[in-house]
Regions:
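Beta-strand-rich domain onsets/edges
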Residues: 1-18, 24, 32
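Exposed beta-strand and adjacent loop surfaces of beta-rich binding modules
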Residues: 18, 34-38, 94-96
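Residue-level recognition of well-ordered beta-strand positions that form the cores
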Residues: 20-22, 40-42, 84, 100-102, ...
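Short beta-strands and strand-coil junctions in structured, solvent-facing domains, enriched
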Residues: 26-30, 46-48
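Short loop/turn segments at connectors of secondary-structure elements within structured domains
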Residues: 31-35, 91-93, 109
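Extended low-complexity, serine/threonine- and proline-enriched intrinsically disordered segments
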Residues: 35-55, 99-101
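Short, solvent-exposed, Trp/other aromatic-anchored flexible loops in extracytoplasmic proteins
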Residues: 54-96, 102-106
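Short beta-strand elements
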Residues: 106-119
Length: 119
């Protein structure tokens, strides 16, 4: 999720997170998969062995098992999925975004990405 970032509010959109998620196959090639994505936002606890603090926000799951729905979020030039997640409030601290990928065969993959607030 290296391209993932906080986005500021403007006249058109609320503050949010632009999240990019890539899934790799056994040959380390980024691929499309029929999966469901779940996003959760946590406070970042500074100088802690467990930096993930209180959960701030969740979003409804993104079920991408339908090919047409999957294509809506897939950015072929990046070989990744792009999600625009609206925030309930303006970002005022650093966060950790956790994404869980749920496969149809009940496997789960989880990744976390730190998000730094911009001045």
């Amino acid at each position: 999720m290296p391209l993932t970032e906080l986005t500021a509010a403007n006249d058109v959109a609320k503050a949010g997170i632009r999240a990019y998620v890539g899934l790799m196959d056994e040959y380390d090639c980024q691929q499309k998969w029929p999966v469901t994505f779940r996003f959760e936002l946590y406070q970042q606890v500074p100088r802690s062995a467990e930096p993930k603090g209180k959960r701030i926000q969740t979003w409804p799951d993104f079920n991408l098992t339908d090919p047409a729905k999957n294509n809506q979020f897939w950015k072929d030039f990046l070989r990744a999925y792009e999600f625009n997640l609206e925030l309930d409030s303006a970002p005022d601290q650093n966060y950790i975004l956790q994404v869980t990928c749920l496969f149809p065969d009940n496997r789960r993959l989880t990744a976390e990405s730190p998000l730094k607030k911009t001045p």
